[in-house]
Amino acid sequence: MRCPFCAHDDSQVKDSRPAEDNAAIRRRRQCSKCGARFTTFERVQLRDVTVVKSDDKREAFDRSKLEQSVTLACRKRGVTQEQIDQLVSGIQRQVETAGEGEIASTRIGEMVMDGLRQIDSVAYIRFASVYRDFSEARDFEEFASTVQEAAKD
């Protein structure tokens, strides 16, 4: 594995352990040239999946983009990185095991909302505000009231 610090092509694995609920392997590596230590994650990729956007553009499924969106929604909310990793890994597994080469971005958005609803209601509303394109304060109020009603049931 190439060192991110000096770009040398050789590194040794110093520690290896399961991560993300056994969906990945976390490896601590050390560069044999500069001695820098860094962490890598190894994940199974079942198939290449294309995401179909609302404007009909297509792009490869990008786990890091999904993780970035979830992390942004959960910022300053007390949601652990482990919870975020589990949610993202679960969504990635659903996307890859769906048996289709393409998936609508709206379907992924619904998966994220379902997961966030169970983790943190504020993160859920934050994500929904972007995903559903809230344009006024009234949109937030209406959505928040539906979340509160659902919580009572």
Swiss-Prot record:
Query: Which key words tag this protein in UniProt?
Result: ATP-binding, DNA-binding, Metal-binding, Nucleotide-binding, Repressor, Transcription, Transcription regulation, Zinc, Zinc-finger
Can you cite a GO biological process for this protein? negative regulation of DNA-templated transcription
Quick check: keyword DNA-binding in the entry?
yes
Which sequence ranges does the entry mark as zinc finger (unnamed)?
A: 3-34
Could you give the cofactor binding note from the entry?
Answer: Binds 1 zinc ion.
Give any Pfam family that matches.
Answer: Zn_ribbon_NrdR
What InterPro entries does the record tag this protein with? Answer: ATP-cone_dom, NrdR-like_N, RNR_NrdR-like
Q: What cofactor requirement does the entry state?
A: Zn(2+)
Instruction: List residues of the ATP-cone domain.
Output: 49-139
State the HAMAP family in the record: NrdR
What's this protein's family per the entry?
Belongs to the NrdR family.
Q: Outline what the protein does.
A: Negatively regulates transcription of bacterial ribonucleotide reductase nrd genes and operons by binding to NrdR-boxes.
NCBIfam families assigned = transcriptional regulator NrdR
This protein's name: Transcriptional repressor NrdR
